[in-house]
Structures are given as structure tokens and as C-alpha cells.
Amino acid sequence: MSEITTLQPSLLWKWFDQICAIPHPSHYEDTLANFIVNWAKEKHFFVERDEVGNVLIRKPATKGMENHTPVVLQAHLDMVPQANEGNPHDFTKDPIQPYIDGEWVKARGTTLGSDNGIGLASTLAVLESNDLAHPPLEVLLTMTEETGMDGAKGLRHNWLQSEILINTDTEEIGEIYIGCAGGINANFEIPVQYETNTFEHSAQITLKGLRGGHSGGDIHTGRANAIKVLARVLAKLSQNQPHFALSEIRGGSIRNAIPREAAAVLAFNGDVKTIESAVENLAVVLKEELAIAEPNFTLFVESAEKAPTVFTAQSTQTVINALNVLPNGVIRNSDVVKNVVESSLSVGVLKTEGNVVKSTILVRSLIESGKYYVTEMLSSLAILANAKVEFSAPYPGWQPVNDSTILDVTRKHYAEVLGEQPVVKVIHAGLECGLLKEHYPNIEMISVGPTIRNAHSPDEKVEIATVQTYWDLLTRVLADIPAK
């Protein structure tokens, strides 16, 4: 056990510590799911897994609440695996190492997994508790949310018995989410041709130290995208420096996180100091430009092993130009929902694989037409760059409903717990609620949770005091669910 088990509420933190001890990155959450299933069987709860691996647990109502409206608490089982450069952490084998840092819980050198591990822990703590009042209760734990919402998409029909769903994936205390953006993946592939490397020198340009973050929730903050900044650097170098050729370009590691690092390996003739000086000058400009948003930004040149082949001159320029004009970030703010992004995209991963440079992009929008406007932009660019773009794994947004029983009850108890009215809002991030609503169109839904910062990055942290507030809210709401 780690030191976080000394925190309150103790049952929730005990469960989160256990969750951290069992590796559960996306696509590797079966061990955690099976652990929970076996625990539920030992407690003699109804427990079942569906065809895609989702877990459903049922607990009878406490005495006197048997005829109250049944509720399902929902969380996802997987976490985003991100580690600091040089950290050998294997997310499929190594436990997360949480620790207390003042008012926050963090992890040592990796993502913490408080998204959605705290929510998951809260559902299990409710199940284990013997002194909480609640109606007939279900807990739904979904698979592989972070890389495509596979569990929510494949959820068994007519499985849930509840009429109210509380999603636990919100990352701001004092807020109730009632709607979210939909999304679609885009794979953008630029074909490249190679030639024998006859250049004298090779070097790697590396960009690192960016903050990264959630590609939906943080897309409006002005944080730099490492892939886009690197493309800008290469475009500037190609204008002013002697001819060079790329042999590799890469950046980012996961589609739904803003890339923190990127690098390009290039070959060139002439004085090495010419490239070094040019990059140093660009670094000065960029550091000044990004001083507030990215205080730890670094850009540097280092020697690299000579590759046997390099991109042709035409392929080098095509890759640089296509990446430099590839849209990224906020496309449009919502006219309907104040201070919320309507449509965006984030270039999440860049790889050189054989004869293509491949970019993985996540498009988000509150409205379907906005989502497909962005995909049309990418299709047009693909034509201009002689590239190929394919779209996959679309998921719907969650359309807000401003009047529901669960919203009224949650507002009431949030005001009591906080001493002020909560903020009811729609977010520019993907929650599973839109997909769950397709399976169960008549179910009422809200989403709540504690304050989490820098999700999807190794700087992720959860605010300790807000976990207690979230727990107080959740338990009060469950005790006040009305009769049918």
C-alpha cells in the first residue's frame, strides 16, 4: 500500500491505490477487470461481462429504498499510458506509483490514471460500503474508452436496468456535465520516395519539454503541439539553409494527447554549425513566443547516425509543407454554448513507416456537421499533397438535456456541499455518454467528478480535497434519488 491510503475518504483511496497497483493501459485492462469480477463474486453481487468485456455489477437497494429509481454508476477501466522521456516504465507490467505532493496526488514519471481511476474507485467504494443509503444500484465499467470507446460502442443491449446514469469522468469539481463533443479518427498518410544518402552529415533536431495535455479539454489553452512546431522549424530551415533531406520524422505517442515531443533526422552538406546556429536562432524566437504557454520548451540539434537512404528532395518538401499546413487546434467556437469550443482537431502522433509518413489525428465537434467539415478539410489537403486520408471510429456527441430528475437532485446537493451553485455545462471532450445514450435513449444522464489537471500527460494530478467533495456529493445524491 502507498501513502495515499491515509487520505479520506479512506475506502475510495484504498480502491484507487489497488487500481494503481494493477497495470491497465488501454487494451490491457483485462487483469483489472478480472480482479474486480472476482472481488464482486466474493461479495456475492450479481456480476457479468458482456461480449466486449464490459463489467456489470448489481447491488440491491438499502432498506427503505427498494422502490426508488434504480441508478447506474459508470466509469471506464483503462488509462492513458504516457511517461516522461527516458522513463523505462512498462505500462503493461509495472504498477503506477502514486504519491502525495501537497494538495495533490501525482504519479512518479507517468500518467496517474486518475482519469478515470478516481471515478472507478468511487463506484467500487459505493459497492463495498455498508453504511450508504442508495436505490437499486448498478455499476458499469467499460473497456478501452481512451482509444476508441470500444466498450461503450459494443455495450450489450437491454443489459442495464437503471433509469438514471451517473458518469464519473468529469475533471472539475463544482461542474455538472450534461453534454459533450463527438469525434472521429483520421489517419493521414504522405507517401515518400527514398534515394541513397550521399550527404556528408546527419543530425537530429529535437523538440521537447512541452506541457501536452488532453487534446479536447486543453485544446483551447494555447499549448503548443510538438509536431506542428517541428514542422514550422523545418519549413523555416528549408527556406534559408542549404539543401537537406529528411530520413525520419516522428512525434507524439497517443491520438488523444497533445504531443509534448517531436524529432526529425536530416542529412546535409556543408558546415554543421550553420544548421546548429539556425536552430538556435529559431529556438530563441519560439521560446519568447511560447514563454507563457510553454515555459519548459527546448529545441536543439544533436549528431545522428547516418542513414543509408533519405527522402528525395521532392518528398522532403512535400512532407514539410503538408505538415506545416495541416490544420490543428480550435477550428470554431460554439454559437450555442458560451465559452465552449465547437470543432477542433489535434495532430496526435507522427511516424515514419516504410514509404509513408503517417499522422494520427483526432477530430472533435459538438455538432455532426462541424465534425465532417473538418474531415473535408483533411480530404482536400490530402488531394493537394498527393496523400491518403482514412477516417475511422466515429462516435456521437452527447446532446444536452437541461431538465431532468438527476440534474435537479445533483444541483441541490452540490449547492449544499459547495455553498454555491454548480456550473452546468457542455464540454469539448469525448465522454461515453453519447454512445451509451444510443443504446439506452430514455436514460437520464449527468457526469461529475473531482478536479484533475493535465490528464493524458505525466503531469497529471488530482486535487485531494476535491475527491472528498466529490464523494460527499455522490453519496448524498444516491441517498436522495426519488421513488419511482
Swiss-Prot record:
Cofactor or coenzyme needed: Zn(2+); Co(2+)
User: What keywords is this UniProt entry annotated with?
Assistant: Cobalt, Dipeptidase, Hydrolase, Metal-binding, Metalloprotease, Protease, Zinc
Q: What does the record note about the cofactor? A: Binds 2 Zn(2+) ions per subunit. Can also use Co(2+).
Task: Indicate whether Isomerase appears among the record's keywords.
Answer: no
The answer, when asked if Manganese is one of the entry's keywords, is: no
* Positions annotated as active site in the UniProt record: D78, E145
Question: Which residues make up the binding site for Zn(2+) 1?
Answer: D115, E146, H456
- Record-annotated residues binding Zn(2+) 2? H76, D115, D169
> Example GO biological process term?
proteolysis
Report TM segments. Answer: none
Q: What class of enzyme is it?
A: hydrolase
Q: Which GO terms describe its molecular function?
A: metal ion binding; metallodipeptidase activity
Q: What is its EC number?
A: 3.4.13.18
- Catalyses which reaction? Hydrolysis of dipeptides, preferentially hydrophobic dipeptides including prolyl amino acids
Q: Which GO terms describe its cellular component?
A: cytosol
Q: Which family does it belong to?
A: Belongs to the peptidase M20C family.
- Role played: Dipeptidase with broad substrate specificity.
Question: What protein am I looking at?
Answer: Cytosol non-specific dipeptidase
Tell me the organism.
Answer: Haemophilus influenzae (strain ATCC 51907 / DSM 11121 / KW20 / Rd)
